[in-house]
Amino acid sequence: MTDRSETGFQPSTTAAVKRTSFSILGAISVSHLLNDMIQSLILAIYPLLQAEFSLSFAQIGLITLTYQLTASLLQPLIGLYTDKHPQPYSLPIGMGFTLSGILLLAVATTFPVVLLAAALVGTGSSVFHPESSRVARMASGGRHGLAQS
């Protein structure tokens, strides 16, 4: 077994640390936390929505389906697009969609409006996640595991 110092090869662990932008990673982490907490709000208020709109379990399932379809199906498409054409402003745009969905949910008077609100929150998630992943990777300084955690 050869000691790395004998071969003259010294791994540059400090170089990666110096290039890691912890302030950007912190901002992305806080934004991601807020984004995911807001999305979880929909699940948490199912009992309130059921009581307010006299929803059946099927209708509650439709709320989940609407959110999941927009969040899951749009995200890879948006990711493909932003890989080729980075959109740094998509982070606040994604959060704006999520905010719009939550605000619409707060004033919803009919079930279709609740579905639209869920779709807006899902769209916000699908826009936010690809770009936040890209920004975290760029700020990682080569420490991709750290950036994604």
Where are the model-predicted features located?
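Conserved MFS/SLC helix-loop-helix module at the cytosolic interface between two early adjacent transmembrane helices
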Residues: 72-112
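Juxtamembrane helix-start elements in MFS-like secondary transporters
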Residues: 56-64
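Cytosolic juxtamembrane N-terminal segment immediately preceding the first transmembrane helix
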Residues: 2-31, 35-36
